Structures are given as structure tokens and as C-alpha cells.
Amino acid sequence: MTSRWLFATALGAAVAGHAGPNPFAAGVRTTDPLTPAAEQKTFILPAGFKIQLFAAEPQINKPMNMAFDARGRLWVTSTLEYPFPVKPGTKGRDSVKILEDTNGDGRADKVATFADGLNIPTGVYPYKDGVIVWSIPNIWHLRDTDGDGRPDRREKLYGPLGYERDTHGMNSSFTRGLDGWLHATHGFNNHTTVRGSDGTEIRLQSGNTYRVRLDGSSVQQVTWGQVNPFGMCLDPRGNFYTADCHSSPIYQLIPGAYYPSFGKPHDGLGYAPRVILHSHGSTAICGILFYDDNLWPKKYLGNLFVGNVMTSRVNRDTLQFDGSSPNGTEAPDFLKTTDPWFRPVDLQLGPDGALYIADFYNRIIGHYEVPLNHPGRDRTRGRIWRVTYAGKTHPKLDLTTPAKAVAELSSPNLTRRQLALNHLADIHGQRAISALKKQSAHHLSAWALHRLGKLTPAELATLAQSPQPLARLHAMRILGALSQWKPAQRELVMQGLVAADPHVKRAAVEALALHPAAAHVKPLAEATEKFLLFDSLQVKGSREADDHLIHTLRISLRNQLRAPGAFAGIPNLPANLNRDLITRAALGVATPEAGDFLIRQLPRLKGDPTPVIRHAARYAADLDPLAPFIEKQFASNLLEQARLFNAMLDSARERGRPLSKAIRAWAGRLAINLLRPVTSADSARRLTDGAQIARDLQLATAADPLRKMAADSSVDTNARAAAVDALGRILQPSAFAAVVKPILGSHTTPASLREAVVITAAALPPLQSQLTEALATAPAGQQLKFARALAAAKPGADTLLKTIALGRAPATLLLDQRVKEQLPAALRSQAIKLAANVELPNANVAKIIAARLKDFRAKGGDTKRGSEVFKLACAACHQRDGEGGNIGPQLDGIGSRGAERVIEDVLDPNRNVDLAFRYSIIKLKNNQTLLGLKRREAGQAIVFADLAGKETTIPKADIAKQTPTTRSLMPDNLAAALSPADFNALLAYLLMEK
């Protein structure tokens, strides 16, 4: 359930002693399918637990999501179509089934198809006279108004929603909140706009969570980010948890927070904290359950369970709380098996007290790791398992009267309590008021009364002053859900803000986040000052005390600063109040007032000023004060000035506004100072930064020192290349030609410098004869780089074709995909003729892979050297053990795939490329062509990652056209780029990561 690199852990204890390949590491399982009865015998559970088959094919097909209704029946979305959706207007073969155990033997003896004709349904929630379900391309309310067990009304609530890019990352995990909203996960890679009938609208790309009203009226985003969340649950305090692939297996969601995702920045406040620091040996986590019941041994109370579809296990974590923050510890796996086809995609706690597991029983689970049309994908087998302890179960759920439903609000079983609450609010309605009033001090009764509009201010105040922390916590949540506060209600929240119980305090902070006002800045800043530690939260390593509360405080303070007049009132705050707290929160406020405030704070700021300067440059009304501050503050540190200028430049591009004269003047002085010859360890960096600033400003006064740099063989090669690049922007073509002709003509010129000249000169007619000679005399590997550079501009493309036509360069260059993509349209027919009947010398990738595998198995590799090769060849884009870039998928667990598969992924990266990692061809209005992976839109600019993994911000106004490709940004020439020894070393290093 993840992106291209899906790597799992070894099987572990269940098969630890077995020789041969690990069957649980294979993307395509090598074993044969088992019958349900045979599979049942493979499960390993703790002592006292029993697993039963609740349902299986042909009763159901592939189960996706499950949910219980008020009668204790299990609703499940079942698919035959996955992973290919049926075409619009075509009836699908998928369905929603209702499973019921009528005789109490633990097996579904009554299976009804409630709705069919669906199209890869995932999220499901039984509601009133029917069910709310996602089925491509809408979220539907399917209603049975005549009681015949089939929907006679199909109402579209929300849609159409995105599914075209990915059918395993859609709208799933429907979970009802205590306030009546329906929460959902939005998965990997799809682009979706969700609109409510009241005009509310959110836009989602890849992992996110959101909530909707069940009548289609309104939508709100809850959190931003995660890679591919699939699975959501609620705990007794009303906190939501999700299971995510790739970023972290478990999060406790903080409303308004940002979570790590591919290529997405946070909101200025940093990413929300994690619950666990381990990965459960896989990036394929699906389904999550918070156990709250009294039928299992006490050690399981408050545990989290997640499905791991790659290792075929149900993992378990115990929770300890640091204040209000859950801190998970990896516990022994709850369920293991010897059958690699077991795929636990969803977990639910039944009202009977049993754990229900949806088993997407399959040889293949990876959506990108294995071609979607692989014949080994099973379409029909699916099972649902039921796990009990010592035969203990709860009696059949009965919510038929208000009194019975109110009684269930005190059940030890979390699912029964939630079902009772929703049934009281949705079905019994006004008839339940009397029964609810009798125990309005119970927090769930209060929630039901609130949803029915019958909770009085006095009853809410009583709840807020209860001796029970759980009741006070829910009082804060109900206060947050109110549309407006009376003065007395605001005072209740202020009391909660200073409560001794951290959960109550955090709920009060969340309530304030929903009611922003300038008057709330002071109390929140004071509360934040008591808890906030200034070190940023780290993805790995030690955690701050109560990090979830700290992050919630930051979000809430940020929201107050968005209120009208909030920044104007800051000078009136107590002098001893730490302004750094407000400064940090202001980084999340995208207004001119925030930008101007941040500029005023710079002289007294502690720590790295980059985030403040970047944010101020993006939003402040007047940027000119930034220049003298930076120039004075870092007078002796030109490199720091350069770094801060580049941050400002990126922000200015995102803003779509040119730099002011004052800032350009400072940057010009900075560039000239950086270009002065010095003898120091950082001289190459100084010269490079100076050249890059001169290029960005097209600084004519820097031309002379840049000429000297470019011609001086004693200068660092990268700095000389930067000088060439800058001169190409500053000088007229004839003057530039005079500078670079000697460089191109010298056989002692370093290869990387020659490449820089070719890239810059490709668009300049005066240099084409020199480019012809350079291309003709270059080694084969460099010829390809030259060809790619030349193809990006019309003059260079002409030169490329003429050189090939003269027989001075091989026509095989024209078979390179990147060359073909960049060639101007007018020259493509000529290129096709020149390349006719030409074959790539290494066209048989399979033979190359086989040869590399044979060589590695014979010789092995040096892992220490492999670490160095990884840093040079891979770390710009890929992360391993938290180190490296995040342009491409992380490589944790890659070693469990085995040598053959890893070699395939390295040497044939274009075999099966996820949409999220396909690069685009960017045609600029100056006729330059670039190749890059679109990372994100940032205001009036787009951020791309180039082929070296470096991010570049390009103004939208400079882009003429973007054309997506089907290819990976990852180079496909590593077999040639790395020596056999280095390739083997890299492979050995990667295979260590299991």
C-alpha cells in the first residue's frame, strides 16, 4: 500500500530457522494460496486467544474497509475490480456486504449484498437507513427507504473526487467523531477537490485527513500531510489515530498540524510529533485499532494494533503518556502467520468484544512494486477473521430504546459506546432527551445533548467543573465545537488552560484554536512559555516532554495571530513575556502583518534567522529593512549573507515580486565581495556563491572577476562552472563566446567544466562550431551528457543533428529518452531518420542485470565503500535511516528485497514509475528546456527537483509549457556510471538495511 520502493522486514521468529529466500520479503509471494481452513491453522497468537473465520470467499471478495452498525452487524466494502477502476458510465462488480452472526457461533451465517455495481469502494459508514460509502468517483449515501435491504436512493454527497492517479490512495477509513462529523483519510498521489453544498472547499494532494457533514453540506481539512494514511480510529478521549505508510506507522492527529510527506514543506511550525520511533519493519501499514474494553488481559488495555500487509502480521504497541502525549513502545507482534498471503488491511473492535481483521488475501499487495497487470494478482479471495480471548464476548447489542442506548454509553467497550452515542443523536433524537438529561454529567450524554441542541450552558459548566478529568476534557471539546462563546464559556476554557491535568489543558488549547481572537494571544503565550522547549522536534532521537501539547500550543497561538488586530496588540503585552514564542508562531501566519512583525523581531532573535527572513520576504509589505540588518549582523560572514539572500530570492519568486533596489544593491555588494580572491578553506564556496548571486542578478559589474575565474585553472572546477553559468546570463553571446572558446578547445579542461560550458552555450549561435568539435571528441559517457544539453535549445539541437549526420557523433545518442523529449518538435522527424535502424548497445537490460547479479554473488562488496558511494550517488534524493534527501522514496528496509530485486530497481528505474516520481519537461519562455520533478507550487512559483536532486524555484510566469513523462528522475545509466567494484559496494550497503 505504498509507493515504488516498498521494503519489508524479515519474517522473524515464525520462519527464522528456515533456509532459503524469505517468503515474506517477496513482492510476489512464491507460495500457493491456502483454503480458509488451512490458513486458519497458520496463525500464531498469544496464549488464551482464539481466531475464527468470520467470513470468506465466495461470501465476500477482497475486503477493504469495515464498520459496525447499531444492530451489531458488520458492513464491509468488497472488491473484484481493484486495482483497475471500471470506465465512467460502466457498472462495476464491487459491493457493500452486510455480515451478521445470527446464532452466536462467531461466524457470519447471514450475508446480504446491500449495494452492488460499485467501483473500488473503500471507506464505509452505516448511517440511518443505509450507508455512506466511497465508490469511484463520489462519496455516496445509499439509502434503503422502503426496508427491502437494498438501496432505492443513491445520493451523491461529495464528488467527483480524484482517483485517476492511484486507486489504492483514495477516500477511506471513515470514522465518526464525537461531534458528529465523519472523518476520512485521503491517500497517496491523488489530486482531489472536495466541496460542500454550503460553499466550503478543500484541495487535497496525496496524504491528508479531512471531515465532512453527513448530509453533504460542509467539508473541513483536519490535518495536512502523511504519505498514504489507510486506517483511522478513535480513543476514549476523542483523539484520532491514523496508520500511515512511509512517514511513520502511527500518528495521534493534532488538528491543524502538518505531517511529513514526499516533497511537502510544513506550515512554518514544524512537523507534528510522532507516536513511535520504530517502523515495525515495513512501510506497508494498514488499519489501526485502539483497544478499550475489559475482555482481554489488562496489559492490552490502551494498546494500539496495526495491520502490516508486507510482513503479514498484526503489530502491537503499548502507550505511555508524557503528559498528554502518547509515547509508543514496540511490543511483541500480536498475530503472526506462516502464510505469506495473509494481508491485514483493516482492524475493527466489534461490539461483541472481538477483534475483526479484514484479510485482503493475495499473492501481491504492492501497488507500484509489482505491475498492476501482473497475472499473479488474486481478485477473488478474501477473508475476515475474528479474534477473542478465553471465549469471552459481550451480549448482543440492543439500542432499540433511548434508555437502552443511554445505558450503553457506560459500556466498557469503546465501539458500543460510540454506536450508542451516534444512535441517540441520529435515530432516537428528541425522544432521547429525557433519558440523556438524567445523566447529563456523563460526557457522552453531554455530547449527544450537544448534537441535539439541548445541552444547556449550566449543564456544560457542570461538566467542565467535574472532579473527573475525562469529563472536564470532553467539556473543553464541546466548548470548542460551539460556534460562539458567551463570556462565562470563555472563562471555562481559560480555567482549562491552566488545569493540572495535561489532557484537559490540551483540550482547552484546541478549543482556543477553534475560536481565534486577539485577546487570546496573551493567555496562550503565557501557557506556551511554561512548556515550550526551543529545540526543534526531531524525527529520530529523544523527544520533548509532552511534545503533542507543545505543538498544539503553537498551532493555537498561530491561529490567534491570524485574528484581526492580533499583531497590533503585541506591543501592549507584558514586557516580561517571551516574544520568541510569538515569533515562532508567526512563522505560520501568511499575512503582511506577520511579515512586518517578523522583520521587527530580527534584531532580538535568537538562533537561525533563516526561517524568519524567508517568511518575511514572502509576506512583509516592506522588505528593505532586511538588507541592512543582514549586512550588519553578518558583516564578517559573507557565506551566511549569501545563504540568507538565496532564501529571500526563493521567497520573492514565490511571491511573484521583483527584488527592491535596496536589496539588489546589497546583493550586488555581496557578490563582488564574495568574488574577491582569498586564500581560505571556504574560498571555493565563496566564489561559487558569488557567481550564483551575480547570475541571478545579471550583475554586469561582476563580469571581469567572473572572466578571470572561468579562465583560471587553479580555481575550483565547480566555481569555474558557476562563473561560466553566470557569464552566460550577463554577457552578450559574442563576448561570452570569447571567454569559453579556450575552455572548450583545451583538452586539459575538466569534464564537468566542459559540460557546464555546453549547457550554457547550447542556445548561442556563435559557439556552435566549438560545440560540434567538443561533441565529436568527447568520450562516450560525456557525449550523452553533451547531447542532452544541446537538445534543450534550437541552435544546440541543430548542432547535435549536424554532427551526427556528418558521422562525427553516434546516432545512438538520439535514442536516449531525455534527448528525444527535449528536441524541438521541428527537428524530430530529422532525428528519427538519423536514428533509423540504430539499436542501443545496452538495450538488453535483462542481460545487464543478470551480469551484475552474477558478479555480485561471486565477489560481494565493501559496505564501508558502499556507504560512500550511496552518499555520492543516492543521498541527494533518497533517505536511509533518516539521513539523505526526500526527493524520492525512502530506502529503509530495502535489503529485505534481496539482491536481484534491488539490482532491477537500480538499473531499470523506469520499469514501473509511480506518478508522483515521474519528471516533467519544462519549456521556458526563453526557449530553454529543463527536466525536473514537480515538488510543489509555492505562490507564484513552482519548485522542481532537477536530475541531481537539487530543488529549483521557477516563477510560473517564466514557464511556457509543462509536459509530464512516464519516466523516473532516477538516472538509468548507473551501470555505466559506477565501476563494478563501486556498484557491488553500493549493493552490499543497501542490502544491509533490513
Positions of predicted regions on the chain:
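C-terminal capping alpha-helices of c-type cytochrome domains
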Residues: 54, 129-131, 137, 831-844, ...
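Long, ordered, helix-rich scaffold segments
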Residues: 375, 379-381, 387-869, 887, ...
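Sec-exported extracytoplasmic/periplasmic mature domains
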Residues: 119, 144, 214, 410, ...
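Beta-propeller domains with acidic blade repeats across secreted/periplasmic ectodomains
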Residues: 18-405, 415-419, 423, 474, ...
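Bacterial N-terminal signal peptides that target proteins for export
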Residues: 1-7
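C-type cytochrome heme c attachment motif
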Residues: 182, 354, 382-383, 448, ...
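Bacterial N-terminal signal peptides
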Residues: 8-16
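C-terminal structured "cap/appendage" subdomains that terminate the fold
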Residues: 361-362, 535, 781-785, 792-801, ...
